[in-house]
């Protein structure tokens, strides 16, 4: 059975999700909704500065574009309630606009001619299940209509924090994400549409302190860590490729080797492990949601207790997208 997917919002995440889905048997995108002209959407799908050229053919046609010989309908509806997903057989929508990230808003896709399920590509709040694949996807039972795929940083932090907590018990922690600049920052100094004075400064020329909800949102993914972590972000002048540092106190004293062994044992398709001396450009395009860097593990003795630092890399674009598509595929498979 082929699962038919619709994408609402064909920006960075929407386009990269489309690319990923092209390589998955049994899943296909049959409709895209975006207010941008299809000629522009097709061009941005074909050419990508950070992720490279699309491996396939893209041709603009009346009403959409043809990708590898398959026609994809493109509509331009502002209100999800007006998108006729059903005509194209869409069962599940990837909500990637950023404007319908809360449950009530995302549910607008579930109208009479709409879809059956929605995956939000952003933190969704306390009233939807927040899923980081291979960390807590087993909380889904298939009856849900709207779920959240969390944020890119939460997808990096969660598997590392879970492995650490399962092995040694986290008491408290602070995380910092050193994060690539994104489209919500100015390329040159100028007024920021959200009124943020720091994001109004040139993103490719500054280290820009920013907030992140990833640490606090960890409680939605790993309930036993609720209230135990906090954190912040520093946006840096790279177009993609980010890293998360987590400093914690643990229930027991440990060594660097013990920590690294626990992380290696916890590795899977979503949580990678490396001992190579890599830099940020080396993780562009990786499909791990989080790539643990064993070379950066630190343990400091402090008056009989310890401070422990662990580090994991992520491509804030492709790592996150790969996780979203894993979640979407699983969600469709168990749907009831």
UniProtKB/Swiss-Prot annotation:
GO CC entries: cytoplasm
Name the record gives this protein: Glyceraldehyde-3-phosphate dehydrogenase
Gene source species: Streptococcus pyogenes serotype M3 (strain ATCC BAA-595 / MGAS315)
Annotated GO MF terms: glyceraldehyde-3-phosphate dehydrogenase (NAD+) (phosphorylating) activity; NAD binding; NADP binding
Keywords of the record: Cytoplasm, Glycolysis, NAD, Nucleotide-binding, Oxidoreductase
SMART domains: Gp_dh_N
DNA damage in keyword set: no
Principal EC category: oxidoreductase
Alphabetical GO biological process terms: glucose metabolic process; glycolytic process
Catalytic activity from the UniProt record: D-glyceraldehyde 3-phosphate + phosphate + NAD(+) = (2R)-3-phospho-glyceroyl phosphate + NADH + H(+)
Residues engaged in binding NAD(+): 12-13, 34, 78, 121, 316
Miscellaneous field: Binds human plasminogen.
PANTHER family: GLYCERALDEHYDE-3-PHOSPHATE DEHYDROGENASE 2
EC number annotated for this UniProt entry: 1.2.1.12
Pfam families linked: Gp_dh_C, Gp_dh_N
Gene3D superfamilies per record: Dihydrodipicolinate Reductase, domain 2 (3.30.360.10), NAD(P)-binding Rossmann-like Domain (3.40.50.720)
Superkingdom in the source lineage: Bacteria
Main subcellular location: cytoplasm
Residues of the active site: 152
Subunit structure: Homotetramer.
Binding site for D-glyceraldehyde 3-phosphate: 151-153, 182, 199, 212-213, 235
Site (Activates thiol group during catalysis): 179
């Amino acid at each position: 059975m082929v699962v038919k997917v619709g994408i609402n919002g064909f920006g960075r995440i929407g386009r990269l999700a489309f690319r990923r889905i092209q390589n998955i048997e049994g899943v296909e995108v049959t409709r895209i909704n975006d207010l941008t002209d299809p000629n522009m959407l097709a061009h941005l799908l074909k050419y990508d500065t950070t992720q490279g050229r699309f491996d396939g053919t893209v041709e603009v046609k009346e009403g959409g574009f043809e990708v590898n010989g398959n026609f994809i309908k493109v509509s331009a509806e502002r209100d999800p309630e007006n998108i006729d997903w059903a005509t194209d057989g869409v069962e599940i929508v990837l909500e990637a606009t950023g404007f319908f990230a809360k449950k009530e808003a995302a549910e607008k896709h579930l109208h009479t001619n709409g879809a059956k399920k929605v995956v939000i590509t952003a933190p969704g709040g306390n009233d939807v299940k927040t899923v980081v694949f291979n960390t807590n996807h087993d909380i889904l039972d298939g009856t849900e209509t709207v779920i959240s795929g969390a944020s890119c940083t939460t997808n990096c932090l969660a598997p590392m924090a879970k492995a650490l907590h399962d092995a040694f018990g986290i008491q408290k922690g602070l995380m910092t994400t050193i994060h690539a600049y994104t489209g919500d920052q100015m390329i040159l100094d100028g007024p920021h549409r959200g009124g943020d004075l720091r994001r109004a400064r040139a993103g490719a020329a500054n280290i820009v302190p920013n907030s992140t909800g990833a640490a606090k949102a960890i409680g939605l993914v790993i309930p036993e860590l609720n209230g135990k972590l906090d954190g912040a972000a520093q946006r840096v002048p790279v177009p993609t490729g980010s890293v998360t540092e987590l400093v914690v106190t643990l229930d027991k004293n440990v060594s660097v080797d013990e920590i690294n062994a626990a992380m290696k044992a916890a590795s899977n398709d979503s949580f990678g492990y490396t001992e190579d001396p890599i830099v940020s450009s080396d993780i562009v395009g990786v499909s791990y949601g989080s790539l643990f860097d064993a070379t950066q593990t630190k343990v400091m003795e402090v008056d009989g207790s310890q401070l422990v630092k662990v580090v994991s890399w992520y491509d804030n674009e492709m790592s996150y997208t790969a996780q979203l598509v894993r979640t979407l595929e699983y969600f469709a498979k168990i749907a009831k």
